[in-house]
Amino acid sequence: MAKLAVTGGGRCNITNSFEHVRSLKDVYPRGTNLMKRLLKSFSANDLLAWFENEGIRFTTQEDGCVFPCSQDAMQIVRCLERLMSESGVQLLCGTRVLKITDLGNHRHRLTFADGREEDFDNVILSSGGTSADFLRSMLPHDIGITPTVPSLFTFRTGDDPLKSLMGTVVEHTRLSIPGSGISSEGILLVTDWGLSGPAALKLSSYAARFLNEKQYRAPLCINWAGCTENEVHEEIALLAEVNSKKLVVNAGLSRLSTRLWKHLCQKSGISGEARWADLGKKATNKLCSTLCADNEEIIGRVNFKDEFVTCGGVALNEINSADMECKKHNGLYFTGEVLDIDAVTGGFNLQAAWSTAFAVAAGL
């Protein structure tokens, strides 16, 4: 519930319309095939209809993110708490489970931190991004656990001049990590610590394991223009023709802010006094190269607001995809982020939680 209350900056980005999703692989780097099946049984539309039946109305942003019209995550929390109360669900807060033991015959024993033990017919683990070490100590030892690492974060960069552009937003960029084959595109935000925004968050998700192995230090290539180098050359040629008498720093690409354009000109070695008419081929090529392949350095990561997503968890080959039941231990089920499923930002992680939970409920 605590995690639900902070998602979407406290507004609860409950799901996504999926209207702009070309491939589920783009939004679910891990768990793509499972999500294809689950979304057929319980889609974003099914989720919204379920909550609307409880009196909650929703609004969808241009980017597909869905929020309650109240813009208040607590409305969702209160709704779920009410439904649990009406159904007789007993909620034990501050109660920690240390171990789950399979007793056979569909029975499991929970060992609590205070020493108590209780037996249950069915156990559903929905603990979120729990560490792999804790999962290994809590679950039966024959269940495969994929190591957990952070998968949704922003980047610390080493370029101080870039950080001076704090607050700059570029609507369409392409990011890549040279030598890895990993890339992303989207809106990029320059912050006082480095880079954020959808493009950076997507890249952090796609490259979660790669960056963890590199201890969050890696080269970063930024395509500020968001297009090919040939296309940029054509744009620059037109700019030079139309603005031949103007200073290069004062007549740049309209989609880039004046501050960013001046920064990129300076990085390309173009003087503040240079006019377009005087810009030679070498300087033009350097400018185009900087626009399309600006080299920066990732030197660390920063958690995205109060949201913390991990990749890893219970390996997907350990569960039955129809109802999320553990293949080796009948009566033990897993939902949400405790599984090795994670997504980019935009409501997709919550949808995975809703869809896996529905699969369990339908199977019980």
Give short role names for the model-derived ranges.
Residues 160-181:
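Extended, Lys/Arg-enriched charged tracts that mediate electrostatic binding to polyanionic substrates
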Residues 20-23, 40, 46-64, 113, ...:
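Residue-level recognition of phosphate/Mg2+-coordinating polar/acidic sites
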Residues 2-90:
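Conserved N-terminal/central alpha/beta ligand/cofactor-binding core
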Residues 122-164:
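Glycine-rich loop(s) and the adjacent beta-strand/alpha-helix scaffold that form part
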Residues 97-98, 110, 117-130, 138-139, ...:
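Short hydrophobic core segments
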Residues 91-95, 147-149, 336:
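Short loop/edge segments at beta-strand edges and connector loops
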Residues 122, 126-133, 137, 340-364:
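A conserved FAD-binding loop/helix module that cradles the flavin
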